[in-house]
UniProtKB/Swiss-Prot annotation:
Gene3D superfamilies: Winged helix-like DNA-binding domain superfamily/Winged helix DNA-binding domain. Pfam families: DUF480. This is UPF0502 protein YceH. It comes from Escherichia coli O1:K1 / APEC. InterPro entries: DUF480, WH-like_DNA-bd_sf, WH_DNA-bd_sf. Keywords: Acetylation.
């Protein structure tokens, strides 16, 4: 695997991929925009509290590795960043919209079941059914230029196996111990989280609109 991202690099790229699809009017992102996206409390696991300098360091590293590029001029008062990780003009990694949605959600939240992925990726791509999710995961696991995801052992109390991306190297397949008394159905939890994400993004758009009207 030629892609080797640190946890922070994966978070930054995942955020840019997400915002490119869900809030295109705010994309590319400024440093402050990337900081806000990285530290977002919805659709992030783990929740982080990165400083601007920490995010700037990751952005600089990713630009040097040609995973991002800077955008300036044409009325932009600040430098902004856009991803070149996939589907860029000269890049090698080409992904479908469904594949982008799954990879992004895995970069942002780590290992998840197909049911969780379907709900949490819904803002980026609407899967017709679970079969489409599972077939897309299998395609990512069996690509000639991959594999890009791997299926993990089933966790105690879970009906589905989890999948994890391989852009940060091999994954230690050690199922987490689950307290069955506190177990929550993954699909229901994922649907609630998807609604929280939608509310957060609508609030972000409203704040941006109000700030624009106030200028």
């Amino acid at each position: 695997m030629k892609y080797q991202l640190t946890a922070l690099e994966a978070r930054v790229i995942g955020c840019l991929l997400e915002k490119q699809v869900t809030t295109p009017e705010q994309y590319p992102l400024s440093v402050n925009g990337v900081v806000t996206a990285c530290n977002q409390k919805t659709n992030r696991e783990p929740v982080m509290n990165l400083s601007e300098s920490e995010v700037q360091e990751q952005l600089d590293n990713l630009v040097k590795r040609h995973y991002l590029r800077t955008v300036s001029g044409f009325g932009n008062r600040v430098t902004k960043y856009e991803q070149r990780f996939c589907n860029s003009e000269f890049g090698d990694l080409k992904l479908s919209a469904a594949e982008v949605a799954l990879i992004t959600t895995l970069l942002l939240r780590g290992a998840q079941t197909p049911g969780e992925l379907r709900s949490r990726a819904a803002r980026m791509y609407e899967f017709s059914d679970m079969a489409e999710v599972e077939s897309t995961l299998e395609q990512l696991a069996n690509r000639e230029d991959g594999p890009f995801v791997v299926r993990l052992a089933r966790e105690p109390g879970k009906r589905e196996s989890r999948y994890m991306h391989l852009f940060s190297g091999e994954v230690e397949d050690q199922p987490a111990v689950m307290d069955m008394s506190n177990a929550v159905d993954g699909d229901l939890q994922a649907r609630v989280e998807a609604l929280e994400i939608e509310v957060a993004e609508l609030k972000q758009r409203l704040d941006s609109l109000l700030a624009h009207l106030g200028d």
